[in-house]
């Protein structure tokens, strides 16, 4: 008898989903300490049960395919398959569910974030049974975390290298981000560092354009660093962006920065790729360079609430791949960032052991097994009036970057840097004395203005500047 073949467009799709549930939905499964765990926010297509979708996610991101194949009998699928072991509805949302999937550790190459992401956030995100899918969190087990080098140096080693303790670090992105000549760029770097900043920074899209080739920029910036260090007696740095069209060119630029003796370089880890970033992090560990990481392109991936990858996952990926700094949002500036959610992934970047806390978006307890921490970078639309909130939110182990908030000072770059340095030290001193910066931060800034005309001028310029938009990224 010849079997009947269904030719309707949806028939094969339905059959495939039903097959997944039989094998990959296992609510009785006991999670192992070595499993990599994922929390997915699923929006099923109309009429598709969440159990079928959860099973499809587990299957398509591990061993499954759309039909039964004879080679299944040549291996142990029970050993290697992903398993959807729990599904819960999302409160306040229609037809959205959190699916928890456990993956055996043997599915992934040791020390490879690229391989991890290729499986977990690969083809499954285009699966027809799902209207939308978002990876909310990952649990990296100690057995897998220990296969990674992680950040080249970490927070404490960075402080030892630059000899700065007891306060947050201050930075500034040079503006305009594009169009300056190398010499004028170096001049702006020098003025900001001399004025009191710890770091200045290339913008993420500064690479090697016709108006400013990378080697010229590196040379003038190195001169600015050495001159400002000689005049202030402090160790200074500039995040030289080594991101390039090829990995070979990237490493060439990193080596030039090392030869010039600068302390830190920069990389755009999402646009350049995780493999390139891991190679660069290993190089920085070997040569003593600090590595600043920019997250350009992240909002394309993480901003929508129901589809993509949450930034806490991208932050975990960076901690595995390697970076000493990572931009993390500000809560109070011009860029997206809700307070509790931001603090949740900031803790995942800095701390060694983080407890599960759904109120902050942390779905799993994470043990980093002494992997070095990543310093969060707050940047984007911040100025001196934001300083109390930034100190209260981020504490000391953070880099606060004021681009326009430094270079937009009416008296120039160096006074802008001085205003930020005075504001930071005033807020830090007040906090250490027991002042509640959330309630009395404005009074602290106003009091400091009496002793700093640069700060007073900055406060006058930016007293009315606010970015009061409702955040999209909510729990």
Curated annotation (Swiss-Prot):
Residues the record marks as active site: 175, 294
Propeptide: 1-2
Cofactor, how bound (note): Binds 1 Mg(2+) ion per subunit.
Binding site residues for Mg(2+): 201, 203-204
Modified residues (N-acetylproline): 3
Catalyzed reactions: 2 (2R)-3-phosphoglycerate + 2 H(+) = D-ribulose 1,5-bisphosphate + CO2 + H2O; D-ribulose 1,5-bisphosphate + O2 = 2-phosphoglycolate + (2R)-3-phosphoglycerate + 2 H(+)
Binding site for substrate: 123, 173, 177, 295, 327, 379
GO terms classed as biological process: photorespiration; reductive pentose-phosphate cycle
Domain of life: Eukaryota
Alphabetic keyword roster: Acetylation, Calvin cycle, Carbon dioxide fixation, Chloroplast, Lyase, Magnesium, Metal-binding, Methylation, Monooxygenase, Oxidoreductase, Photorespiration, Photosynthesis, Plastid
GO cellular component: chloroplast
Subcellular location: Plastid, Chloroplast
Site description Transition state stabilizer, residues in chain: 334
Pfam families: RuBisCO_large (PF00016), RuBisCO_large_N (PF02788)
Major place of residence: plastid
Cofactor: Mg(2+)
EC numbers: 4.1.1.39
Residue(s) carrying N6,N6,N6-trimethyllysine: 14
Family in the record: Belongs to the RuBisCO large chain family. Type I subfamily.
Subunit field text: Heterohexadecamer of 8 large chains and 8 small chains.
Entry function: RuBisCO catalyzes two reactions: the carboxylation of D-ribulose 1,5-bisphosphate, the primary event in carbon dioxide fixation, as well as the oxidative fragmentation of the pentose substrate in the photorespiration process. Both reactions occur simultaneously and in competition at the same active site.
Name the UniProt record assigns to this protein: Ribulose bisphosphate carboxylase large chain
Organism: Stigeoclonium helveticum (Green alga)
Gene (UniProt): rbcL
């Amino acid at each position: 008898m010849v079997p009947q073949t269904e030719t309707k467009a949806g028939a094969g799709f339905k059959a495939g989903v039903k097959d997944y549930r039989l094998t990959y939905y296992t609510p009785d499964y006991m999670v192992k300490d070595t499993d990599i765990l994922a929390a997915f926010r699923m929006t099923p297509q109309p009429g598709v049960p969440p159990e079928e979708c959860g099973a499809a996610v587990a299957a398509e991101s591990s061993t499954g395919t759309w039909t039964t194949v004879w080679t299944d009998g040549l291996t142990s699928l029970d050993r290697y398959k992903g398993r959807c072991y729990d599904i819960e509805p999302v409160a306040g949302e229609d037809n959205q569910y959190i699916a928890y999937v456990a993956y055996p550790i043997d599915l992934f190459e040791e020390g490879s974030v690229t391989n991890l992401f290729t499986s977990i956030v690969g083809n499954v995100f285009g699966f027809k049974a799902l209207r939308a899918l978002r990876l909310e969190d990952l649990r990296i087990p100690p057995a897998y975390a220990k296969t990674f080098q992680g950040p080249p140096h970490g927070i404490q080693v960075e402080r030892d290298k630059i000899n700065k303790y007891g306060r947050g670090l201050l930075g500034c992105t040079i503006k305009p981000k594009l169009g300056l000549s190398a010499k004028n760029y170096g001049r702006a770097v020098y003025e900001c560092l001399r004025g009191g900043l710890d770091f200045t920074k290339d913008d993420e899209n500064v690479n090697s354009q016709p108006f400013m080739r990378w080697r010229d920029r590196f040379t003038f910036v190195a001169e600015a660093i050495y001159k400002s260090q000689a005049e202030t007696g402090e160790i200074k740095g500039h995040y030289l962006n080594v991101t390039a069209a090829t990995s070979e060119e990237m490493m060439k630029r990193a080596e030039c920065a090392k030869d010039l003796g600068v302390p830190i370089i920069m990389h755009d880890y999402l646009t350049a790729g995780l493999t390139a970033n891991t190679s660069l992090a290993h190089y920085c560990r070997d040569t003593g360079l600090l590595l600043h990481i920019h997250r350009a392109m992240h909002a394309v991936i993480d901003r929508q609430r129901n589809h993509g990858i949450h930034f806490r996952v991208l932050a975990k990926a960076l901690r595995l791949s390697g970076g000493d700094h990572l931009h993390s949002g500000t809560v109070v500036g011009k860029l997206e960032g809700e307070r509790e959610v931001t603090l949740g992934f900031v803790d995942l970047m800095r701390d060694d052991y983080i407890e599960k806390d759904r109120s902050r978006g942390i779905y799993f307890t994470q043990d980093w097994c002494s992997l070095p921490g990543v310093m969060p970078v707050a940047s984007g639309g911040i100025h001196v009036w934001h300083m109390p909130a930034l100190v209260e939110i981020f504490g000391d182990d953070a880099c606060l970057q004021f681009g326009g908030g430094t270079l937009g000072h009416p008296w120039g770059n160096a006074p802008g840097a001085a205003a930020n340095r005075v504001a930071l030290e005033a807020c830090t001193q007040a906090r250490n004395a027991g002042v509640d910066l959330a309630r009395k931060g404005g009074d602290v800034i106003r009091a400091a203005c009496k002793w700093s005309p640069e700060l007073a001028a900055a406060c006058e310029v930016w007293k009315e500047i606010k970015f009061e938009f409702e955040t999209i990224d909510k729990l």
